[in-house]
Amino acid sequence: MSDLALPAWQASLVAIGAVPGAWLRLRVVNHLEPMVPRKHWGTFAVNMVAAFALGLVLALQAKCAPESGASPLILLIGVGFFGSLSTFSTFAVEVLNTLREHRWSEALVLAVGSILGGLLAVAAGVGLANG
């Protein structure tokens, strides 16, 4: 088995967690769409929530069970749920579309804000878990 292969039970946990995460992302983005001027701000919001929550969960796991590594809970919630709740590819497409529409400042704010905001959100989640 190659280093990239994942046992079926682990892949199943990721898949089971991914379904509600993707569903929630779709629901939140569709709910926010009429309230915000551009669809990408819904994606921004779910990415920030997912980054915060993933930082919190990973820090709690490291604090409570540091030796467990990629535990079933991390595979289910961290990789599956929060991995599908957040979406880097949609973020990248939305930045590109904003650039194509010649909205340079908005594209810059979206790109930099997403990256820095994501880092700050993870740090806040870690801080909450450790504080």
UniProtKB/Swiss-Prot annotation:
Function: Fluoride-specific ion channel. Important for reducing fluoride concentration in the cell, thus reducing its toxicity.
Regulation: Na(+) is not transported, but it plays an essential structural role and its presence is essential for fluoride channel function.
Entry binding sites for Na(+): G83, S86
Protein name: Fluoride-specific ion channel FluC 1
GO biological process: cellular detoxification of fluoride
Keyword Transmembrane carried by entry: yes
Transmembrane residue ranges: 4-24, 40-60, 73-93, 108-128
Catalytic activity: fluoride(in) = fluoride(out)
